[in-house]
């Protein structure tokens, strides 16, 4: 074990990660040496110690089965105050991978640290303790997020979208039906709708009826003019309204709901036009002005 921990100082990332995987496979005998490594002077060693304790290697979550020692959780909680941001990030994620609810209060406090906020939210979702639900829901609604400048439609210009993505994913992991309305409304957001849809499918069957109600309520499923303008930039995209309808139908189908035949025909024909993976040259147009692309 000591020899493997020494490899955390190796210049090769592959060597360092392989050493971490080996320590995880060794199991319980690695715990105390790794906890001690969290205090090492070298921040790289501290990072890899945190990752190993959380099972954060190419074999994600294999650490969950054996790292349940209270000393591990306490040591990682203390590491949330590390002066190096990378170490704090790794410790935050490790606590989520371990999945011990004793870390809830510390992770809620870590949400105040802008550097690790989205990781703290993700970890709270992995743990799934309902005590954290209100704070994660607040993050989804943008509370406590600092943003400078005016966002450009359709573009990510701050940490805001990343935090909301983490919050949407985490809300699904709580599997609490009370968040379904918030996730459904998030489907209107062109950037975040995929995460919201995934979260709804994780919550399960209880999301079906609210989604159907949303689908057939013209007022509820209205798209703001700005959103329509953003999604109409590229001629190969659906209108914002059609894109919203399509994601709702796809989510319902994933949940096992069979739409009426006419809806299937509509969604299929619309989907054929939503080819965002096509090279720009295939359509000849790009950008808000629809300028013609010319071959070089």
Tell where the protein language model's regions lie, with residue ranges.
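Structural detector for internal amphipathic alpha-helices that build alpha-solenoid repeat scaffolds
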Residues: 6, 13-28, 36, 44-68, ...
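N-terminal compositionally biased or targeting/leader segments
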Residues: 74, 105, 181, 277-278, ...
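Terminal, low-structured helical/coil segments at or just beyond the last alpha-helical repeat
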Residues: 254-273, 280-281, 294-295
């Amino acid at each position: 074990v000591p020899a493997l921990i020494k490899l955390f100082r190796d210049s090769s990332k592959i060597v360092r990660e392989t050493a971490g995987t080996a320590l995880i496979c060794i199991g319980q005998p690695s715990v105390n040496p790794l906890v001690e490594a969290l205090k090492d002077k070298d921040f790289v060693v501290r990072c890899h110690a945190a990752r190993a304790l959380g099972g954060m290697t190419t074999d994600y979550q294999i650490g969950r089965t054996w790292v349940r020692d209270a000393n591990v959780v306490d040591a990682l909680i203390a590491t949330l105050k590390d002066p190096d941001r990378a170490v704090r990030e790794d410790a935050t994620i490790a606590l989520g991978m371990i999945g011990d609810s004793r870390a809830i209060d510390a992770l809620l406090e870590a949400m105040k640290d802008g550097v690790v906020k989205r990781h703290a939210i993700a970890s709270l979702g992995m743990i799934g303790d309902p005590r954290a639900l209100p704070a994660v829901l607040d993050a989804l609604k943008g509370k406590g997020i600092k943003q400078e400048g005016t966002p450009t439609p359709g573009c990510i210009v701050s940490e805001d979208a990343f935090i909301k993505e983490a919050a949407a994913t985490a809300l699904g992991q709580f599997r609490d039906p009370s968040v379904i309305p918030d996730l459904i409304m998030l489907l209107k957001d062109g950037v975040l709708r995929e995460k919201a849809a995934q979260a709804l499918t994780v919550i399960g069957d209880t999301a079906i009826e609210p989604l159907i109600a949303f689908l057939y309520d013209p007022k509820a499923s209205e798209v703001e003019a700005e959103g329509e303008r953003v999604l109409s930039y590229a001629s190969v995209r659906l209108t914002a309204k059609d894109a919203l309808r399509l994601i709702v139908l796809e989510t319902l189908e994933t949940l096992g709901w069979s739409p009426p035949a006419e809806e299937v025909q509509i969604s299929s024909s619309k989907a054929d036009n939503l080819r965002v993976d096509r090279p720009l040259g295939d359509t000849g147009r790009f950008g808000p002005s629809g300028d013609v692309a010319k071959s070089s």
